[in-house]
Amino acid sequence: HSDSVNGVFPDIRTTDGTTWQSISANMPPALPGEASFAASGTCVATQGGRNAWIATGGSAIARILATRDGGDTWNAYDTPLVSSPSAGAISVAFRNPWNGIVGGGDLGSNDSADAATSNDGGRTWTLTNKPPVQGSIFCLSYVQGIGHHDLEAGDHDYDNAVVITAETAPNFDSGSAAWTPDEGQTWFQLPGVSGYWAVAFATPKAGWFVGNGGQILKISF
């Protein structure tokens, strides 16, 4: 996936990891200036071999581009996140084909972090309560992680839990982090967690933040 060029998203697809084909003709037309933020590298999320979502910004509306057939067809859906040439949806994650969360903000503002959830595969989005972080949400991750089918019984307490990390302008070398047990209805700060650009989980007991200067921080629930 790439920023739009002349109104077209120059996206490519692989089914074997070796060969690639353009699916640009399958993508929705881009809005003027529409792009995806590099930030944490989580502007694209997948579920299985057929479902994928792309978070965008940089234009008048922050959108989610979604496919349910492996990229043969795509639809664009509006989100309520702030959007402008320096703002939009930055990170997206889904815990199953229907339930997901997207986060972002304005890279030029330190009071713009926002997030929204979907329960219909990305078609409609509802703002969460305000996340208690400064800057823009660079990354978010479900705590259930990539191994959620093999979780221990107690780990399912975290099926709806999400961790976010945010960075502040202008240098994006400091910031804050928080987590929610219920997809944004309630939030809790993670004191002392600052300067991390991305977070991901294998299981609730094994998650990692990565950030400036080669920082790595393990987080466990």
Feature annotation, model-predicted:
Residues 1-221:
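Residue-level hotspots at or immediately adjacent to binding/recognition sites across diverse folds
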